[in-house]
């Protein structure tokens, strides 16, 4: 089971993407727990997730967010704007899988 946290400005705008990622995970046979949170809560959730993704609207926080995630050995990346805008759950799930595989 991979625990994935998506972090955006308020934790709401990623809701539809989370649903599409859950559908993609189920279709691919990937056991995943995927939730959306406000970026301001990253430090609270980082110890309990396997991968963190930032929404494009909070990409400016990547350096600070990476410091938080590095302390917990959690890989982090910014969701590509195109994948985010198209709500492409499969591509974002593929990004997660690439982060945890190496």
Regions found by a protein language model. Give the residues of each.
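Short acidic/histidine-rich motifs immediately flanking catalytic phosphotransfer sites
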Residues: 46-52
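A short, gly/pro- and small-residue-rich
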Residues: 61-81
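Generic structural signal for helix capping and beta-alpha/helix-loop junctions
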Residues: 42-44, 86
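Short glycine-rich anion-binding loops that position phosphate/pyrophosphate groups of nucleotides
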Residues: 57-59
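Short, well-ordered alpha-helices that flank and scaffold nucleotide-derived cofactor binding pockets
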Residues: 19, 23-26, 67, 94, ...
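Ser/Thr/Gly-rich flexible loops in soluble cytosolic domains mediating phosphotransfer, phosphorylation
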Residues: 75-102
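Conserved active-site segments centered on acidic
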Residues: 2-39
């Amino acid at each position: 089971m991979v625990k994935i946290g998506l972090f955006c400005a308020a934790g709401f705008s990623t809701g539809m993407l989370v649903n599409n990622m859950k559908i993609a995970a189920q279709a691919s046979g990937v056991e995943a727990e995927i939730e959306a949170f406000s970026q301001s809560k990253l430090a609270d959730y980082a110890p309990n997730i396997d991968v963190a993704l930032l929404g494009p609207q909070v990409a400016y926080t990547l350096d600070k967010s990476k410091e938080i995630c590095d302390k917990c050995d959690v890989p982090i990346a910014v969701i590509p704007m195109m994948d985010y805008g198209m709500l492409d759950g499969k591509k974002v799930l593929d990004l997660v899988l690439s982060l945890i595989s190496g």
